[in-house]
Amino acid sequence: MAEITATVRPTREEVVPSRKRVKLPAWLEVAKPRLIPLLLATTLGGMALSEGWPLSSPRLVCTLGGGALASAAAGVLNCLWEQDLDGRMARTSGRALPSGRLSPTSAFIGAIACTLAAAMLLVSGVNCLAAGLSLLGLCSYVLLYTALLKPRTSQNIVIGGVAGAIPPLVGAAAATGHVGLGGWWLFALVMVWTPAHFWALALLLREDYRAVGIPMLPVVKGPVVTARAIKTYGWITVLLSSLGVFALPSGGAFYGVMLLPYNARLLQLVDRLSLDPDSLVNAKALFRWSILYLFGVCLLLILSRTDLASGFTHQVIQLLSLPTGVH
């Protein structure tokens, strides 16, 4: 008798194990707290790229606190908008809103409260530009991505990724009162990083998206085209990330050297996926590494502004300026 095997696609809980281990209270679950640390990391990256780094402790706390509150508000509003959609999928039907563990009214009040608190904290403790950019990020996530693009186009995350790319601008604005070249560079980097990151997850969950009619790229074009697109954006990410050497006010050489293994690993994983687009193992590995990659880039930006990194850069410049003896 022929043995029949079926491909069992992982759930989101299997892709991100922490979701399975920790059961959050309903009011906290809808705020999507697991997304906040990476957004705050890119906010810190935007600060580190500015001449105003390091910030005073009160300004730093207000910036990160306001950003966390704005992100929480965006998460709640996203859950409110998609509660009917979540209720139609087995994977998400147990979430707080579709399961009835939290009422829509309570969630909406919480979202408004977080939005107002974020605005007040950023205006009073940072500046109006940082507050305005933070609210722009909230609105772009809920209105541009969730409501307009996600249900209509397979390029939803390419355009809608602007929402996740705004925190570096908030960080830069908090540090100097304006958005300089470094802030815009990190904004662009997050924009081009987002498609490869999200499409890797969408490859794992494409049957869920297909079942409810969400036109994610793996659903519309299939894994081969998606893997090819991921490889393209992966290379763009690597090339653009290398320009951070010039975006940093100091410590660029340190950043450039330490970035090499991060980029090498990213290229290795996108290449593996392009060779075997149907591999769930490869898609999962890329998704997980992409998160660590962006955390790593932001950490390198911060470390590059230390005295140790500046000394390293100075030594590199001295070595490059030594006479070669060739005339």
From Swiss-Prot:
The keyword Cell inner membrane applies. GO terms for molecular function: protoheme IX farnesyltransferase activity. InterPro entries: Protohaem_IX_farnesylTrfase, UbiA_prenyltransferase, UbiA_prenylTrfase_CS, UbiA_sf. The keyword Hydrolase does not apply. Pathway: Porphyrin-containing compound metabolism; heme O biosynthesis; heme O from protoheme: step 1/1. The chain crosses the membrane at residues 35-55, 60-80, 106-126, 129-149, 157-177, 185-205, 234-254, 283-303. Keywords: Cell inner membrane, Cell membrane, Heme biosynthesis, Membrane, Transferase, Transmembrane, Transmembrane helix. It is found in: Cell inner membrane. It catalyses: heme b + (2E,6E)-farnesyl diphosphate + H2O = Fe(II)-heme o + diphosphate. GO terms for biological process: heme O biosynthetic process. It is a multi-pass membrane protein. It comes from the Bacteria. It is an enzyme of class 2 (transferase). One of its GO terms (cellular component) is plasma membrane. Pfam families: UbiA (PF01040). PANTHER family: 4-HYDROXYBENZOATE SOLANESYLTRANSFERASE (PTHR43448:SF7), PROTOHEME IX FARNESYLTRANSFERASE, MITOCHONDRIAL (PTHR43448). Carbon 2 of the heme B porphyrin ring is defined according to the Fischer nomenclature. Belongs to the UbiA prenyltransferase family. Protoheme IX farnesyltransferase subfamily. Converts heme B (protoheme IX) to heme O by substitution of the vinyl group on carbon 2 of heme B porphyrin ring with a hydroxyethyl farnesyl side group. This is Protoheme IX farnesyltransferase. It comes from Synechococcus sp. (strain CC9605). The gene is ctaB.
